[in-house]
Amino acid sequence: SDRVIWSEQGRLHLAYTATNEDVSANIFTIVNDVDGNSVGADHGIRVGDMVLVSSASLTLRGYCSAVSTNTATILPYAEATFDSAGFSDSAGAGAYRILVIGSEFEKGTDGRSAANSPKFKSHSNKHIIMKDYYEVSGSDTTQIGWIEVAGEEGQSGYLWYLKAEGDTRARFTDYLEMTMLEAETAVTNAGAIGGTDGGALQDGTQGLFQAITTRGHQTTGVTGVNAATDLAEFDAILAVFDQNGAIEENMMFVDRGTSLAIDDMLASMNSYGAGGTSYGVFDNSEDMALNLGFSGFRRGSYDFYKSDFKYLNDKGTRGALNDTVTNIRGVVIPAGVSSVYDEQLGRNMKRPFLHVRYRASQTDDRKMKTWITGSVGAATSGKDVMEVHYLSERCLVTQGANNFMLMN
């Protein structure tokens, strides 16, 4: 009950990396699926399958004539053996790719001898408990000032402690979001609290950035070198999306430098903007300033909606970090929902790709709890103070992380 557990279905089609066990006998050893997960004897290649087999320089079509544990015998259609086609026993592990494209059977033969079942990959994350606290003496709660105080949380009045309490609340709510972005799980024997339980209940929780780093994709492109280079690097991002879920609509949350680099890239492609004849908003009036700040655009078959990420720019948050090598410049997040199997509820359901899970019951909701103790107002203790407590228990669920992109 301390973890959120969900399962995501693997790819529909069967594709693997393989090593050529014996090219003269056309035997391949299956190593991993195309996402790098070890499969071995659990591969889905069956006798009768028609496949594509590729090396770095050649693709052949073949027929699977035999399967034994983690190996498959594949007979090429256009060659006597893969050896004669230029394949080598000395190629490294995973040097070849095998893709199942169909099947072929002789007249009057029996059907399949084995069935393929969907493969699911289970993921989990751990709730963490976050707390904060504000205290003011009973005497100070009675000090009325001459200037009205108004805070970001909507509090107002002539009591100065309202401002401090409101700031504490605002800071805590910011921490709730920042933790969901930045948190990571402690590894065994890590210096952080705990992390010594062999991974069963690691301390910490997997935030968005760690989820994308471990299960998603990363890019160092689109840095503003020049428009042509940025465009080529952006197209490389599209190629990665093509290989995965190909979610059409995506949100881009980026820092100022990356935002301007994307604007420059798009402006260079806009002949009107480059020629100075497009005046942007307000019915394209020539009396208005030229608008080169692009908030949404389409490239290939994808729509992107760009937004400046204040968290990455503000000197009070990540903008204060001096890391110029691995610092995060932005994140691309797919819009919409995905279908997953919730192992705790025992059913399939549609959830947003990115959402927060909280601990709650009919008697207690720990999404955001606030309570007051002390002797101010209704006394709950003998302490001459007013204590304001804040608590939340939550974790982030990043579904389909292979559709996310982190910009470093």
Predicted regions and their residues:
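Flexible, glycine/threonine- and acidic-rich loop/arm segments that mediate assembly and lattice contacts
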Residues: 1-296, 302, 308-318, 322, ...
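Short, surface-exposed, low-complexity cationic segments
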Residues: 326-327
